UniProtKB/Swiss-Prot annotation:
Organism: Zea mays (Maize)
Listed InterPro entries: Beta-tubulin_BS, Beta_tubulin, Tub_FtsZ_C, Tubulin, Tubulin/FtsZ-like_C, Tubulin/FtsZ_2-layer-sand-dom, Tubulin/FtsZ_GTPase_sf, Tubulin_C
Annotated stretches, region: Disordered: 421-445
SUPFAM superfamilies cross-referenced by the UniProt entry: Tubulin C-terminal domain-like (SSF55307), Tubulin nucleotide-binding domain-like (SSF52490)
Annotated coiled-coil segments of the chain: none
The protein's name: Tubulin beta-7 chain
Family per record: Belongs to the tubulin family.
Subcellular location(s) of the protein: Cytoplasm, Cytoskeleton
One CC-aspect GO term: microtubule
Function: Tubulin is the major constituent of microtubules, a cylinder consisting of laterally associated linear protofilaments composed of alpha- and beta-tubulin heterodimers. Microtubules grow by the addition of GTP-tubulin dimers to the microtubule end, where a stabilizing cap forms. Below the cap, tubulin dimers are in GDP-bound state, owing to GTPase activity of alpha-tubulin.
Residue ranges, compositional bias (Acidic residues): 429-445
Main location: cytoplasm
Binding of Mg(2+), residues: 69
Cofactor: Mg(2+)
Length: 445
């Protein structure tokens, strides 16, 4: 079996991670003691991807939980599925990172990192054939961003040929905790560009807008945002957890979605959007799901796909539905909006169907797209970064932990390069490609 090792770090990472395990335990028929109580063989067929079967037939998540303070972990432990995790896999410090990336990456986090790596190694040795890691973290704080990216680079050193998937929550002024979020996020992106293979971008701004506009919640809480995230994470990973053809492991997902190695930041969408506790009363049709899923209002990242072009995209439909109808609808979308897809990557939209729908829905769909419009989000963070950095605001918090201003400048230019690369491929046409090739041939001759 091809196992995936799940790692969650920091307050946000642990909260969305805990929700993710609640959701997938439900889907696989695992109760809160780890016993199987489901009703379908499909639930068990690929259960080993995320769970380790322990003595007495209990299923234990392949999860490592880390934080620099004990608070969030205590609440995970006392939560509904807190007893299902391996007690040794909780690794925490006492000091906290104080929303400071440098503390998470260089000082406090660096002291704790070896204990985390020990647990990661132990879990990896338990695997038959480890396919990769998935990391849940936010980029606005100190632990998830600083220590999270430190762990990613350490794992990269030790397991260079394994896939690294991240679920990264980007900060937003609308749902802001601290003033230094743009610093932390930029320093993290600098790391993720180099060390992660695929990043599912979750963006607090977009999640907030979905709760407010679509779900009509007057004051969205983090619980509401996390409900959306967990539904999306469940959808993105469903093809890894249930038998199926398309994107059945992390590497195949990457092959289908990443045309250029640095451009691995994906927008994710989900349909139908439901608020916590309310289930849909009316079954949706495939055309409605498809239409909702491609709608920019459903994207979990505050960038409008209509302002850019899709390099690649992939859709996972869940529930009992006709594959033929799914393919027709997806073709329909591409034909009607052909200007929004780059023409120089043929067959760049894939779709798959998984028979098991999420709990409480007849059918649902999840969308993962590699769109050049995601540069809007990087631009937004970059502008906030520059506004503070050119006045050297709050820098002493970072230099005091031994960082150099140079590192900020590098991170800033790396992020701006990323934006420029997205722009370059957005403007590229098939003619450019042919022209460049001809030039190269002439040079060779």
């Amino acid at each position: 079996m091809r196992e995936i090792l799940h790692i969650q770090g920091g307050q946000c990472g642990n909260q969305i991670g805990a929700k993710f395990w609640e959701v997938i335990c439900d889907e696989h028929g695992i109760d809160h003691t780890g016993k199987y109580a489901g009703d379908s063989d499909l639930q068990l067929e690929r259960i080993n991807v995320y769970y380790n079967e322990a003595s007495g037939g209990r299923f234990v998540p392949r999860a490592v939980l880390m934080d620099l303070e004990p608070g969030t972990m205590d609440s995970v432990r006392s939560g509904p599925f807190g007893q299902i995790f391996r007690p040794d896999n909780f690794v925490f410090g006492q000091s906290g990172a104080g929303n400071n990336w440098a503390k998470g990456h260089y000082t406090e986090g660096a002291e704790l990192i070896d204990s985390v790596l020990d647990v990661v190694r132990k879990e990896a040795e338990n695997c038959d054939c480890l396919q990769g890691f998935q990391v849940c973290h936010s980029l606005g704080g100190g632990t998830g961003s600083g220590m999270g990216t430190l762990l990613i680079s350490k794992i990269r050193e030790e397991y260079p040929d394994r896939m690294m998937l991240t679920f990264s929550v980007f900060p937003s002024p609308k749902v802001s905790d601290t003033v230094v979020e743009p610093y932390n996020a930029t320093l993290s992106v600098h790391q993720l560009v180099e060390n992660a293979d695929e990043c599912m971008v979750l963006d607090n701004e977009a999640l907030y807008d979905i709760c407010f506009r679509t779900l009509k919640l007057a004051t969205p809480t983090f619980g509401d945002l996390n409900h959306l995230i967990s539904a999306t994470m469940s959808g993105v990973t469903c093809c890894l957890r249930f038998p199926g053809q398309l994107n059945s492991d992390l590497r195949k997902l990457a092959v289908n979605l990443i045309p250029f190695p640095r451009l691995h930041f994906f927008m994710v969408g989900f349909a139908p959007l439901t608020s916590r506790g309310s289930q849909q009363y009316r079954a949706l049709t495939v055309p409605e799901l498809t239409q909702q899923m491609w709608d920019s209002k459903n994207m979990m990242c505050a960038a409008d796909p209509r302002h850019g072009r899709y390099l690649t995209a992939s859709a996972m439909f869940r529930g009992k539905m006709s594959t033929k109808e799914v393919d027709e609808q997806m073709l329909n979308v591409q034909n009607k909006n052909s200007s929004y897809f780059v023409e120089w990557i043929p067959n760049n939209v894939k779709s798959s169907v998984c028979d098991i729908p999420p709990i409480g829905l007849k059918m649902s769909s999840t969308f993962v797209g590699n769109s050049t419009s995601i540069q809007e989000m990087f631009r937004r963070v970059s502008e906030q970064f520059t506004a503070m950095f050119r006045r050297k605001a709050f820098l002493h918090w970072y230099t005091g932990e031994g960082m150099d201003e140079m590192e900020f400048t590098e991170a800033e230019s790396n992020m701006n390069d990323l934006v420029a690369e997205y722009q370059q491929y957005q403007d590229a046409t098939a003619e450019d490609e042919e022209y460049e090739e001809e030039e190269e041939e002439e040079e060779e001759t």
